[in-house]
Amino acid sequence: MKKALLVVSFGTSYHETREKTIDICEDKIKNSLKSHDFFRAYTSNMIINKIKKRDGIEIDNPIQALDKIYEQGYDEVIIQTLHIICGEEFNKLKEQVDGYSSKFKKIVLGRPLLTHIEDYQEAVEAIKHQIPHMESNEAVVFMGHGTLHESHSAYPALEYMLRDNGINAYVGTVEGYPEIEHVIRRLKEGNIKTVNLMPFMLVAGDHAINDMAGDEEDSWKTILEENGFNVRVHLKGLGENSYIQDKFVRHAVKCAENAKFYGIGAGPGDGSLLTIKAVN
């Protein structure tokens, strides 16, 4: 039986950060499932088009990759996402994958980084390894991408668990809630003087480089400094954290072992799984 492994991420057009994040995650997952042939897909058509125009390199979107896998006669497909939450991008991918359920003997989709409580706990433990020692008047501020999808609650849930584990952390988002002004109000209420600014994104790409750490007047760094905070920028994506990389590997392996199609909702039989349908 021919088996394929498809690793899906939002993608990035930054070579160096891709090599430190997406490429390493892909390699680790590939090495954990050596019986499967590897394929890659990005969900961002904007990034796909930019790379094609700039570098002459063609990267498939999920539909193109699945069509290619089907045309090459594969029987089984394991898909592992590198998305952070079960947001719009992941749910779009989930719907796309569901459309191929009748074309393969087995097609399974691994969950994003943050899905159920255990994921948050493991992510917090991983994050501890990248947070510097902080004084009582210091905090870490994470910039998440954010979403208008109902999964936006993942961000305050993450912050709650970080703080419950003794990490003086605040989580804001570029899109959705909470935004930087909400974070600043709470930083002032907490008498914070120094902010360690980090992206809560797989890669330190455009949002992190420009919206978070840029020198423009609307960047988080500039806004925080104008509000009187001493800002230390840590331009390192989650995908550079080896513990986060290994977390995605565990999701892929568990996905392969359980042969479940992951989505949002309680899974039958095993409460640790989130499924929308089981695929034979």
Regions of interest found by a model, annotated:
Residues 259-280:
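Glycine-rich, flexible N-terminal cofactor/catalytic loop recognition
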Residues 1-258:
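Active-site-proximal alpha-helix that buttresses catalytic centers in soluble enzyme cores
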